[in-house]
C-alpha cells in the first residue's frame, strides 16, 4: 500500500501528492485517524480526495494510505432491519464503538455483523456445475425475507464441497473447483457501489407497483421497475408521500435512503415502521426494510455515496428475484453535495452552479432501476423501482435538478404548494403530473381489476380538466350563469377531488386503499353523475339531486374498511333507488 502526503485541505476535499500508483475511485485512509475517503480526480501524482468524515484537525503533511480497492458494500444476511450511514457503517455498532450518540472520526466498524450465526440451507449439491448468479442455498433472514445465497461474479466451476448449518458471514459454506483453483464461498460478497450489478437481460415493465394511494394508482401509476420523481416545495408533503409509498408499496424489499434531509424524518421511519403491519404478510414493515441515514448534519461528501450504496443493495435483492423499491429523499441534497465538491475542485460550473455532469450522474442512478432477468440457471425475474424526491428552491421546477430528473424518469408526481395550503393531501397536482406508463398499466388494470377501469379513469380526468376550465367562467360571471349540466360537472369534480383524491395518511382505513376499493369508490362517484344526468333529463331540479342523503354515504365511503367493501354495493343500490324515486316524483311534478 502506497503512502502519500497531504498538501491541501478544503472542507471535505483533500489533495495529496505521491499518489501515482492510485486509481480514480480508490478508497484511501486519510490522516493519522484513518478517515475514509475516495479519490475523485488524478493529476500527475496528485490526487483529489473527497473525505466521507469530518476533516477538522487534518493538515498538510499528514499521511494518505491507498487501499487499492474501490468503495464497496458488503452484501449478505444482516442487511434487512439494519440502519447504515452513507458508506454502510451500521449506526448501532458505530454508537457502541464510538461510545457516543454522534458520529466520531476514524471509527472502523464492519458493515455486517461478524458474530451472528445464520442457518444456511443448501439447495445445490456436490458435483453441480455453477456460475455467477446461481443460487446455492438460502438463509431465512427475517420472517418475510428468504435470503438467497448466490455464486459471486467471476466464479464458475463445480461444487467440490457444501455444508449445511449455522455460519457467520465470513465462514466458508462451499468450495467451488474452478480453472484457477479452488474458490471458497461465504454468505457474504462485496460489490463496488458505482458499478451496476450485471443481469441476463432487461424486461419491459408491464405490472404496476400499487401504493394504496388513490391519486397515484388511479391517475399516475408507476410500473414495477420504473422510475418516478416527486418534486415539490417545502411543506408540500414529499416526505409523507415517500413514507406512504415505502409503507404500502407492493414490493417485497424497501430501501429507504435519507439523503441530506432532517434527522427527525429518519427517526419517524424508525419509530413507525416496526409498529405498522404489512397488509400482505401481517408482519412488521421493518422486517423488509433497509435504512440508509445520511442526515443534513452528516458530512456532505457521504451524500453521494449513500445514493449509490442504496441502489447497490437494491440491485442485490433484485438479483435474488425480489421486487425492490428504493426511496431517495432527497436527490436535490445529493446534487448540492456534487455542486459543493465541484466548486472546491474549481471545475467550470453549469446552470446555477451545478456541475456540467449533473444530468449524467442522475441518469447513472435512475438507469440502474428496471425489471430484469437475473443471472443464474432459474431465470429469476426481479425489479428495482426508483422513487426520488426533488426539493427545488421555492418550488421552481425549472431549476436544473428537476429538469435533469424529468428527462430521465417516466413518472412525475408534482406536489403543489397551493393544494398543501388548502390542506389537500397528498398534494399531487392532477393537471401538471403525468405517467408515461399509463397505457400499459391501464391494460393491466382492465385485465386484473375491472374491464372498465381505464374508461372510468379517463372520464374522471376529463371532468377534472373541465372543472379547471369552468372555474375561469365562474370567477368572471358567477355560478348562476352556468347551465345545470355544467353545475353538475363541477359538483362531481369536487366530489372526485375531496372524496377520492384527498387521502388521510393517519387514518387507519384511509391510509391504504386496495385497487378493488379504489375501483368501487370511483365507480360510485361517476355512477352518481350518470344517474343525476338521467334525473336532469327527466326534469328534476339539480338542487334536489344534490340534497340526496346518499351523497353523504358516497363521501364517507373512503372510511369503509377493506373487510367491509361489500357495503359500497349497497350504497350503489341505494343511489339508484333514490334517483329513480326522484325521477318518478320530480318528472311528473316538473312536466
Curated annotation (Swiss-Prot):
<dbReference type="Pfam" id="PF00006">
    <property type="entry name" value="ATP-synt_ab"/>
</dbReference>
<comment type="similarity">
    <text>Belongs to the ATPase alpha/beta chains family.</text>
</comment>
<dbReference type="GO" id="GO:0042777">
    <property type="term" value="P:proton motive force-driven plasma membrane ATP synthesis"/>
</dbReference>
<dbReference type="InterPro" id="IPR000194">
    <property type="entry name" value="ATPase_F1/V1/A1_a/bsu_nucl-bd"/>
</dbReference>
<keyword id="KW-0375">Hydrogen ion transport</keyword>
<dbReference type="Pfam" id="PF16886">
    <property type="entry name" value="ATP-synt_ab_Xtn"/>
</dbReference>
<dbReference type="InterPro" id="IPR036121">
    <property type="entry name" value="ATPase_F1/V1/A1_a/bsu_N_sf"/>
</dbReference>
<dbReference type="GO" id="GO:0046933">
    <property type="term" value="F:proton-transporting ATP synthase activity, rotational mechanism"/>
</dbReference>
<dbReference type="InterPro" id="IPR022878">
    <property type="entry name" value="V-ATPase_asu"/>
</dbReference>
<dbReference type="GO" id="GO:0045259">
    <property type="term" value="C:proton-transporting ATP synthase complex"/>
</dbReference>
<dbReference type="Pfam" id="PF02874">
    <property type="entry name" value="ATP-synt_ab_N"/>
</dbReference>
<protein>
    <recommendedName>
        <fullName>V-type ATP synthase alpha chain</fullName>
        <ecNumber>7.1.2.2</ecNumber>
    </recommendedName>
</protein>
<keyword id="KW-0547">Nucleotide-binding</keyword>
<keyword id="KW-1278">Translocase</keyword>
<keyword id="KW-0813">Transport</keyword>
<dbReference type="InterPro" id="IPR031686">
    <property type="entry name" value="ATP-synth_a_Xtn"/>
</dbReference>
<keyword id="KW-0406">Ion transport</keyword>
<dbReference type="InterPro" id="IPR004100">
    <property type="entry name" value="ATPase_F1/V1/A1_a/bsu_N"/>
</dbReference>
<dbReference type="InterPro" id="IPR024034">
    <property type="entry name" value="ATPase_F1/V1_b/a_C"/>
</dbReference>
<dbReference type="GO" id="GO:0005524">
    <property type="term" value="F:ATP binding"/>
</dbReference>
<dbReference type="InterPro" id="IPR023366">
    <property type="entry name" value="ATP_synth_asu-like_sf"/>
</dbReference>
<keyword id="KW-0067">ATP-binding</keyword>
<comment type="function">
    <text>Produces ATP from ADP in the presence of a proton gradient across the membrane. The V-type alpha chain is a catalytic subunit.</text>
</comment>
<dbReference type="InterPro" id="IPR055190">
    <property type="entry name" value="ATP-synt_VA_C"/>
</dbReference>
<keyword id="KW-0066">ATP synthesis</keyword>
<feature type="binding site">
    <location>
        <begin position="232"/>
        <end position="239"/>
    </location>
    <ligand>
        <name>ATP</name>
    </ligand>
</feature>
<dbReference type="Pfam" id="PF22919">
    <property type="entry name" value="ATP-synt_VA_C"/>
</dbReference>
<dbReference type="InterPro" id="IPR020003">
    <property type="entry name" value="ATPase_a/bsu_AS"/>
</dbReference>
<dbReference type="GO" id="GO:0046961">
    <property type="term" value="F:proton-transporting ATPase activity, rotational mechanism"/>
</dbReference>
<dbReference type="InterPro" id="IPR027417">
    <property type="entry name" value="P-loop_NTPase"/>
</dbReference>
Amino acid at each position: 500500500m502506497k503512502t502519500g502526503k497531504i498538501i491541501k485541505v478544503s472542507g471535505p476535499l483533500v489533495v495529496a501528492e505521491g499518489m501515482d500508483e492510485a486509481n480514480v475511485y480508490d478508497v484511501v485512509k486519510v490522516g493519522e485517524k484513518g478517515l475514509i475517503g475516495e479519490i475523485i480526480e488524478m493529476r500527475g501524482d496528485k490526487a483529489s480526495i473527497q473525505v466521507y468524515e469530518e476533516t477538522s484537525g487534518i493538515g498538510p503533511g499528514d499521511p494518505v494510505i491507498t487501499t487499492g480497492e474501490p468503495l464497496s458494500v458488503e452484501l449478505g444476511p444482516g442487511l434487512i432491519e439494519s440502519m447504515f450511514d452513507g458508506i454502510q457503517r451500521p449506526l448501532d455498532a458505530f454508537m457502541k464503538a464510538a461510545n457516543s450518540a454522534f458520529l466520531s472520526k476514524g471509527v472502523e466498524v464492519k458493515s455486517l455483523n461478524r458474530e451472528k450465526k445464520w442457518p444456511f440451507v443448501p439447495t445445490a449439491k456436490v458435483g453441480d456445475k455453477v456460475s455467477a448468479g446461481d443460487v446455492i442455498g438460502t438463509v431465512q433472514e427475517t420472517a418475510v425475507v428468504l435470503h438467497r445465497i448466490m455464486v459471486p461474479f467471476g466464479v464458475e466451476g463445480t461444487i467440490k464441497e457444501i455444508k449445511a448449518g449455522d455460519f457467520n458471514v465470513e465462514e466458508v459454506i462451499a468450495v467451488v473447483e474452478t480453472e484457477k483453483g479452488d474458490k471458497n464461498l461465504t454468505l457474504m460478497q462485496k460489490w463496488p457501489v458505482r458499478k451496476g450489478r450485471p443481469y441476463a437481460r432487461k424486461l419491459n415493465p408491464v405490472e404496476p407497483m400499487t401504493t394504496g394511494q388513490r391519486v397515484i394508482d388511479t391517475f399516475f401509476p408507476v410500473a414495477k421497475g420504473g422510475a418516478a420523481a416527486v418534486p415539490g416545495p417545502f411543506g408540500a408533503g414529499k416526505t409523507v408521500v415517500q413514507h406512504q409509498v415505502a409503507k404500502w408499496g407492493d414490493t417485497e424489499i424497501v430501501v429507504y435512503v435519507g439523503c441530506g434531509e432532517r434527522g427527525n424524518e429518519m427517526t419517524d421511519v424508525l419509530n413507525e415502521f416496526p409498529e405498522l403491519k404489512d397488509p400482505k404478510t401481517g408482519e412488521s414493515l421493518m422486517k423488509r426494510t433497509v435504512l440508509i441515514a445520511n442526515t443534513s448534519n452528516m458530512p456532505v461528501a457521504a451524500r453521494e455515496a449513500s445514493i449509490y450504496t442504496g441502489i447497490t443493495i437494491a440491485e442485490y435483492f433484485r438479483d435474488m428475484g425480489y421486487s425492490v423499491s428504493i426511496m431517495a429523499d432527497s436527490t436535490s441534497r445529493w446534487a448540492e453535495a456534487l455542486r459543493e465538491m465541484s466548486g472546491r475542485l474549481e471545475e467550470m460550473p453549469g446552470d446555477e452552479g451545478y456541475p456540467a455532469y449533473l444530468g449524467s450522474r442522475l441518469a447513472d442512478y435512475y438507469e440502474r432501476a428496471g425489471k430484469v432477468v437475473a443471472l443464474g440457471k432459474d431465470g429469476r425475474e426481479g425489479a428495482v423501482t426508483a422513487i426520488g424526491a426533488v426539493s427545488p428552491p421555492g418550488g421552481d421546477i425549472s431549476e436544473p435538478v428537476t429538469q435533469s430528473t424529468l428527462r430521465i424518469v417516466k413518472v412525475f408526481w408534482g406536489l403543489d404548494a397551493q393544494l398543501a395550503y388548502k390542506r389537500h393531501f397528498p398534494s399531487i397536482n392532477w393537471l401538471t403530473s403525468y405517467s408515461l406508463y399509463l397505457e400499459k398499466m391501464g391494460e393491466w388494470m382492465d385485465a386484473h381489476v375491472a374491464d372498465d377501469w381505464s374508461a372510468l379513469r379517463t372520464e374522471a380526468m376529463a371532468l377534472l380538466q373541465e372543472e379547471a376550465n369552468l372555474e375561469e367562467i365562474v370567477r368572471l360571471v358567477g355560478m348562476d350563469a352556468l347551465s345545470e349540466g355544467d353545475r353538475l360537472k363541477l359538483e362531481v369534480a369536487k366530489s372526485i377531488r375531496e372524496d377520492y383524491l384527498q387521502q388521510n395518511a393517519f387514518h387507519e382505513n384511509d391510509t391504504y386503499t386496495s385497487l378493488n376499493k379504489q375501483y368501487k369508490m370511483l365507480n360510485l362517484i361517476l355512477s352518481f353523475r350518470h344517474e343525476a344526468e338521467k334525473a336532469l333529463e327527466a326534469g328534476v331540479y339539480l338542487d334536489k339531486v344534490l340534497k340526496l342523503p346518499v351523497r353523504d354515504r358516497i363521501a364517507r365511503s373512503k372510511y369503509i374498511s377493506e373487510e367491509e367493501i361489500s357495503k359500497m354495493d349497497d350504497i350503489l343500490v341505494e343511489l339508484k333507488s333514490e334517483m329513480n324515486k326522484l325521477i318518478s316524483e320530480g318528472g311528473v311534478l316538473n312536466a
